[in-house]
Amino acid sequence: SRNVGPNIDSWSEFQPLGVVAGITPFNFPVMVPMWMFPLAIVCGNTFILKPSERDPSSTLYIAQLLKEAGLPDGVMNVVNGDKEAVDVLLSDERIKAVSFVGSTPIAEYIYATANANGKRCQALGGAKNHAIVMPDADIDNAVNQLLGAAFGSSGERCMALSVAVTVGDETADALVSKMSNVM
């Protein structure tokens, strides 16, 4: 900004951190990395992606597509492995920041270990969603949607529904009655 005051200009400069890493879960092997590496790379960083050892293939395919699209070598990197690979990412002084999505106990471990090693850390664990059922809701449809949201993919989603809030006693009674017939 220019002229924010008499003879005063103001501006902000943002500097890349350097090498940053993302540790991703098995249940969203493409979506969660897509939250991480594009922003890191656009901000001028290089990125190390450590996918779940259960399903690394899609991550390798993403890296291949980025290379084919012209991303320079070394900008997007994939490291496979288990906890040992994670611990290297958390302790290597060249890595300045770590992002994680997964279970709460692992998020706590990653957050504590990354911070103990002086890294910036974003550790998202155990996220669940809530649903609100309004008095004018179609109860049959609400039951179907709630069951799908809670138990779809066997509940192995961080967005799985864990709480349904009903507005009004009549709504709650109707929902419980319909649910008890379904289950």
Model-derived features: positions:
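N-terminal Rossmann NAD(P)-binding subdomain characteristic of aldehyde/semialdehyde dehydrogenases
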Residues: 1-37, 71
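Short gly/ser/thr-rich secondary-structure transition/capping motifs
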Residues: 1-7, 79-81, 145-146
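A structured beta-alpha segment of the ubiquitous adenosine-cofactor-binding alpha/beta core
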Residues: 9-10, 77-96
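Beta-loop-alpha module in the N-terminal Rossmann-like domain of NAD(P)-dependent dehydrogenases
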Residues: 20, 27, 80-88, 102-109
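PLP-dependent aminotransferase-like
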Residues: 22, 33-86
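Periplasmic-binding protein-like
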Residues: 38, 97-101
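General beta-strand structural signal in soluble alpha/beta enzymes
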Residues: 49, 78, 100-102, 121-125
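ALDH superfamily catalytic-core signature
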Residues: 105-183
